[in-house]
UniProtKB/Swiss-Prot annotation:
Family, per entry: Belongs to the uridine kinase family.
E.C. number: 2.7.1.48
GO biological process: CTP salvage; UMP salvage
Lineage of the organism: Bacteria, Pseudomonadati, Pseudomonadota, Gammaproteobacteria, Aeromonadales
Species this protein is from: Tolumonas auensis (strain DSM 9187 / NBRC 110442 / TA 4)
InterPro entries linked to this entry: P-loop_NTPase (IPR027417), PRK/URK (IPR006083), Uridine_kinase (IPR026008), Uridine_kinase-like (IPR000764)
HAMAP family cross-referenced by the UniProt entry: Uridine_kinase
Protein name per Swiss-Prot or TrEMBL: Uridine kinase
Reactions this protein catalyses: uridine + ATP = UMP + ADP + H(+); cytidine + ATP = CMP + ADP + H(+)
GO cellular component, one term: cytoplasm
Pathway(s) the chain acts in: Pyrimidine metabolism; CTP biosynthesis via salvage pathway; CTP from cytidine: step 1/3; Pyrimidine metabolism; UMP biosynthesis via salvage pathway; UMP from uridine: step 1/1
Positions contributing to ATP binding: G15, A16, S17, A18, S19, G20, K21, S22
Protein localization: Cytoplasm
GO terms for MF: ATP binding; cytidine kinase activity; uridine kinase activity
């Protein structure tokens, strides 16, 4: 908390893949945008900070353990957050799930009063935790996460069911148990029942309003 900026509220939402992080982030974004204006709030996804693998052949890229902390450039993410807190715009990288590497495009992100950051391993990184005003962990059962992940990755990311299940068994579940679930201890708020938990959403919105006024 020592590295936070009172003029910029950063909310970190962590938890297993397909636990409801993106849904609750979008819901809070949409509802607070209607209340405060779209120039006041923005969402950043940890997936954008997967490390560039363009120097590797595709056969090597697909072997990467994407659920391990080493797959992410958390140092760049932390630096971008610090720049945004200082009132400077940043160029966020974009990532291709089909190519397993970053694209050539970036997204210009201007400073906001509220930044919602969502990703599986946010609370595992001590440098990122220090930048968060509120840290949240989505405590959704793994079997529900797997069903959601299957539907998402097959329908939206062009994956096959077999490849999704193989990845889940080899890396997703083991990395959840090793890195993601233990990071729950750092959460200020633990949210059960996924991204449609209205009580949790209203509580978060109330907390954000309080931080903006304090």
């Amino acid at each position: 908390m020592s590295d936070t900026n009172p003029d910029c509220v950063i909310i970190g939402i962590a938890g297993a893949s397909a636990s409801g992080k993106s849904l609750i982030a979008r819901t809070i974004y949409n509802e607070l945008t209607a209340e405060l204006g779209e120039d006041q709030i923005g969402v950043i996804t940890e997936d954008c900070y997967y490390k560039d693998q363009s120097h590797l052949p595709m056969a090597e890229r697909i072997k990467t353990n994407y659920d391990h902390p080493a797959a992410f450039d958390h140092a760049l993410l932390a630096e971008h957050l610090k720049q945004l807190m200082a009132g400077k715009a940043v160029d966020i990288p974009t990532y291709s799930y089909s190519e397993h590497t970053r694209t050539d495009q970036t997204i210009r992100f201007t400073p906001k009063r509220i930044i919602i950051l969502e990703g599986i391993l946010l609370l595992n990184d001590s440098a990122l935790r220090k930048l968060l005003n509120v840290s949240i962990f989505m405590d959704t059962p793994l079997d529900i996460c797997l069903v959601r992940r299957l539907a998402r990755d097959v329908q939206e990311r062009g994956r096959t069911m077999d490849s999704v299940l193989e990845q889940y068994q080899k890396t997703v579940r083991p990395m959840f148990l090793q890195f993601i679930e233990p990071s729950k201890q750092y959460a200020d708020i633990i949210i059960p029942r996924g991204g449609r938990n209205r009580i949790a959403i209203e509580m978060l919105k109330s907390r954000i309003r309080h931080l903006l006024l304090s």
